[in-house]
């Protein structure tokens, strides 16, 4: 077993950074590599561009309801960036939004369910 929980987390982190750097060398302006599929207590997402390396660290959420996190994250980052946030701030806010969506997932079905895309909407009490 070569999972990060066995002490190889730094190896995976270096591989993620090398992969991001390769994409930058191919012409990408900004790269965010998600670390959510690695088995560890902490999720590390790697952001890289020509002038910044940023590692976003969050506690792993113990749930099987994470379907749609990648698409949701890219949409959230795009939204925050288009509203004038810096790319790093947009990534930070997007990751926080997805974490909140994971924490408030509706727990549908028995398999891997969706996250709660409406987590940031406050619904009036009379409509609940």
Predicted regions, residues:
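Single conserved hydrophobic/aromatic residue that forms the stacking wall/gate
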Residues: 1-12
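Active-site-adjacent loop and "lid" segments of alpha/beta metabolic enzymes
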Residues: 38, 83, 121
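Short, small-residue alpha-helix embedded
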Residues: 63-87
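Short, charged, surface-exposed loops that flank catalytic or proteolytic processing sites
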Residues: 10-16, 82-92
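Gly/Ser/Thr-rich beta-alpha loop segments that engage phosphate groups in nucleotides
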Residues: 9, 37-38, 70-72, 76, ...
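Charged C-terminal helix
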Residues: 88-128
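Conserved phosphate-donor
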Residues: 17-58, 62-63, 108
């Amino acid at each position: 077993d070569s999972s990060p929980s066995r002490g190889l987390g730094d190896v995976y982190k270096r591989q993620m950074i090398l992969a991001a750097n390769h994409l930058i060398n191919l012409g990408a302006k900004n790269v965010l590599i998600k670390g959510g599929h690695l088995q560890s207590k902490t999720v590390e997402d790697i952001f890289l561009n020509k002038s910044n390396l940023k590692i976003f660290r969050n506690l792993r959420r113990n749930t099987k309801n994470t379907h749609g996190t990648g698409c949701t994250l890219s949409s959230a980052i795009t939204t925050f960036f288009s509203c004038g946030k810096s790319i790093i701030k947009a990534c930070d806010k997007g990751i926080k939004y997805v974490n909140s969506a994971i924490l408030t997932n509706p727990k549908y079905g028995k398999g891997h369910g969706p996250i709660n895309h409406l987590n940031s909407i406050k619904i009036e009490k009379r409509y609940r």
